[in-house]
């Protein structure tokens, strides 16, 4: 039974969700995966405003919207009036004015959504598709769904988040939610990319020492586009792979039953040996499958708030 108390006008950050919220969304996503059909009470319209490049998140939201029976408007930032100086607020207000119900937004600015959800004149539903290095709630929830499918519970699970921690919105969202769900969270990666704000959720340690104890190894992409010029010039992909990548030698030391996860896109041969991407214990492509159903659940929550479901 879906909890109607948990409907909401927007979904922008994991910080707004408690454990029960996350489990509620996971259960609805699982229901959609099992064949539940969405029923709209009126035509519903969505637009995906992506101001950063995306393959999985954008197309996954589009697929989710179509599976829900929504009408999806095309939008390309590079050919829009944003190039003429139009503000984000005016762009979103335009979408609302022409009848769009939900805007999924990816933006390079951390917490861009505050200027929208705190504006009393804006009624359109806002779903965060990723903000800078801040939050990625839909990726977080699809990851939680994938872990839940594998283990059934979070309490006592040991989860390692490894890689470019300071630039990763996935690291911040996942660490926060895993902690709320009762998992034991660990971090590893280059010290220069460690974010001390993560210490409230888990413990930073040595990759090779932690790896054999872990139930979930959550690899992170090196965020080349967010590195400083100096960091980018100093980065050596082969050295990174040897020090922090999931090599074949490291994979052989993983705990029996442990799984590999990665939010993608995957830098093969950097974060993970290419042959491990589709290994029997990899859940990377299952994460993508689950992303569609998780995003259906997220959109459903916003549509119910608007009385459209």
Curated annotation (Swiss-Prot):
Metabolic or biological pathway: Pyrimidine metabolism; UMP biosynthesis via de novo pathway; (S)-dihydroorotate from bicarbonate: step 2/3
Domain of life: Bacteria
Pfam families: OTCace, OTCace_N
GO-annotated biological processes: 'de novo' pyrimidine nucleobase biosynthetic process; 'de novo' UMP biosynthetic process; amino acid metabolic process
Gene Ontology CC terms, in alphabetical order: cytosol
Enzyme Commission number, as recorded: 2.1.3.2
InterPro entries noted in UniProt: Asp/Orn_carbamoyltranf_P-bd, Asp/Orn_carbamoylTrfase, Asp/Orn_carbamoylTrfase_sf, Asp_carbamoyltransf, Asp_carbamoyltransf_Asp/Orn-bd
Binding site for carbamoyl phosphate: 56-57, 106, 136, 139, 264-265
One MF term in the entry's GO annotations: aspartate carbamoyltransferase activity
HAMAP family: Asp_carb_tr (MF_00001)
Annotated function: Catalyzes the condensation of carbamoyl phosphate and aspartate to form carbamoyl aspartate and inorganic phosphate, the committed step in the de novo pyrimidine nucleotide biosynthesis pathway.
Subunit structure: Heterododecamer (2C3:3R2) of six catalytic PyrB chains organized as two trimers (C3), and six regulatory PyrI chains organized as three dimers (R2).
Protein name in the entry: Aspartate carbamoyltransferase catalytic subunit
Protein's gene: pyrB
